[in-house]
Amino acid sequence: MNKKSIRDVDLKGKRVFCRVDFNVPMKEGKITDETRIRAALPTIQYLVEQGAKVILASHLGRPKGQVVEELRLTPVAARLGELLGKDVKKADEAFGPVAQEMVAAMNEGDVLVLENVRFYAGEEKNDAELAKEFAALADIFVNDAFGAAHRAHASTAGIADYLPAVSGLLMEKELDVLGKALSNPDRPFTAIIGGAKVKDKIGVIRHLLDKVDNLIIGGGLAYTFVKALGHEIGLSLCEDDKIELAKEFMQLAKEKGVNFYMPVDVVITEEFSETATTKIVNIDSIPSNWEGVDIGPKTREIYADVIKNSKLVVWNGPMGVFEMTPFSQGTKAVGQALADAEGTYSVIGGGDSAAAVEKFGMADKMSHISTGGGASLEFMEGKELPGVVCLNDK
């Protein structure tokens, strides 16, 4: 990575405004999944060890520029203190006199969590005045929030106009792993693209067709491709306005010598429920009043075989409606194939794929799970991320 990281700068005694991604799911004031807090720990611990004064900023939920009591970062700060094993202070504002006083009282190695930056309307507008207020608290800006790197907000990008800007360790790892996958992948390189809609994955499919050896398609978006081949798909998800595009992608794959894998059989159902009756049919035999909801057993075997023979696999999007047990086997099988594959580097592109490997207890078997759903998708589309562009070059 050609961007400076916290390893490239002197941090001792410096006030560091570190943007992290503490946007964790909460229920009645309790954190239900602390993955994102844990992901930021190496950076925070490094800053503490180097003798920095660590000022942490994050958003939580979508308060839309006003104070929402249940979206305060107080429970997050408390949990962070437990995980770090040290006293973590919490400011009830993200800038201004109160925050400035608390920063002024900090010693080297102290940690302070600022209030939810999205309580201020200027955050999502990337307001220069707000960015200046954030910058006034610190000597150095560290961006470790890969999950918000695709947003040009005051605390992720704007602040870098007023302070030296470097990446944290998590951001650095994300950029290294995803960057290598796109620029210099180990081969065979396979991309698995799933999820509900073609329109969400157009950019990533288009970009990856130039890079990959194998492209595997699954999830709801597969049925648009199936229909493009002239098959009936019953009540399965389909974007009729994307059928021509699906044909174009299949033609492009052929021209570029990319092996294009689609379901050969599917799990179908007449209702969405945990007790639904399902059938397995060949891809060209979906009855008119049934809906495809998962890849079938033959498809799972084919996909597992491709995965096993790949050196690098990037996975973005589930193979079916994995939240419901009867329709979860395809997604689980892909996860299992990645977990079992020897000598295969697996990159899970955040979002639903990350949720799936967590759910099936396979997370620790994956080489890299991205902390950014939208950010990793945009990165894999070849887009520049505002939260990365703003960092100082080495």
Curated annotation (Swiss-Prot):
Enzyme class, UniProt record, top EC level: transferase
InterPro entries associated with the record: Phosphoglycerate_kinase, Phosphoglycerate_kinase_CS, Phosphoglycerate_kinase_N, Phosphoglycerate_kinase_sf
UniProt record, GO biological process: gluconeogenesis; glycolytic process
Keyword field: ATP-binding, Cytoplasm, Glycolysis, Kinase, Nucleotide-binding, Phosphoprotein, Transferase
Binding residues annotated for ATP, in chain numbering: K201, G292, E323, G350, G351, D352, S353
Transmembrane domains' residue ranges: none
Binding-site residues, substrate: D21, F22, N23, R36, H59, L60, G61, R62, R118, R151
Claim: Kinase is one of the keywords in the record: yes
GO cellular component terms given for this protein: cytosol
Cellular compartment(s): Cytoplasm
Residues recorded as bearing Phosphothreonine in the entry: T299
Positions of post-translational Phosphoserine modification: S183
Catalytic activity field: (2R)-3-phosphoglycerate + ATP = (2R)-3-phospho-glyceroyl phosphate + ADP
Pathways per UniProt: Carbohydrate degradation; glycolysis; pyruvate from D-glyceraldehyde 3-phosphate: step 2/5
Principal place of residence: cytoplasm
GO MF term list: ADP binding; ATP binding; phosphoglycerate kinase activity
Pfam families registered for this protein in UniProt: PGK
Assigned EC number: 2.7.2.3
Keyword Kinase annotated: yes
Family: Belongs to the phosphoglycerate kinase family.
HAMAP family: Phosphoglyc_kinase
Complex formation: Monomer.
The protein's name: Phosphoglycerate kinase
Provenance organism: Bacillus cereus (strain AH187)
Gene name in the database record: pgk
